[in-house]
């Protein structure tokens, strides 16, 4: 039923974040912009709430592929995303600015990668690092770091070109 969609979306995003899996919210995010240069209030809220829920990406489809205002649509979605990320009053809850008392994801480490990546993000936050550098063969380290939502950018290096292209 339609009334369950918002709750199910939040649950799916949360489960993906907990598992360190990238999650994209897509489909009809800015549908009115197929024919109009201005989105509806509900569409702007959908984009913002997807970001606040912890989505790694929001994606357009028909709006940018077939719509009359593709550039304006991409620009508007970008403006909404940046506004939410920069001005959310509880930014530390969104991005894990503070790590005392747990990660907000899962206080029990599943394995050594989980423990080490949490430690790296926690340390980066404590010392005020400007970036986190991840060396990876498969991309797993980068994905696991990103699940903790550090405020620092994650710079990924790999000897395997396909891993970098995938990330």
Label each region the model flagged.
Residues 9, 64-87:
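C-terminal helical cap(s) of enzyme catalytic domains, especially alpha/beta-barrels
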Residues 18, 77-121:
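Long, charged amphipathic helices and adjacent flexible linkers at domain junctions
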């Amino acid at each position: 039923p339609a009334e369950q969609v918002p709750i199910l979306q939040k649950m799916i995003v949360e489960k993906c974040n907990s598992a360190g899996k990238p999650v994209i919210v897509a489909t009809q995010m800015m549908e009115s912009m197929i024919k109009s240069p201005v989105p509806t209030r509900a569409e702007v809220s959908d984009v913002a709430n997807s970001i606040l829920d912890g989505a790694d990406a929001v994606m357009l489809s028909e709006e940018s592929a077939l719509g009359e205002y593709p550039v304006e649509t991409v620009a508007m979605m970008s403006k909404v995303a940046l506004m939410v990320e920069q001005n959310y009053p509880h930014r530390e809850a969104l991005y894990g600015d503070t790590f005392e008392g747990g990660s907000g994801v899962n206080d029990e480490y599943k394995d050594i990668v989980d423990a080490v990546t949490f430690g790296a993000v926690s340390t980066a936050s404590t010392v005020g690092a400007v970036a986190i550098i991840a060396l990876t063969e498969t991309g797993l380290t980068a994905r696991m770091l990103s699940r903790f939502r550090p405020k620092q950018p994650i710079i990924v290096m790999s000897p395997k070109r396909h891993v970098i292209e995938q990330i």
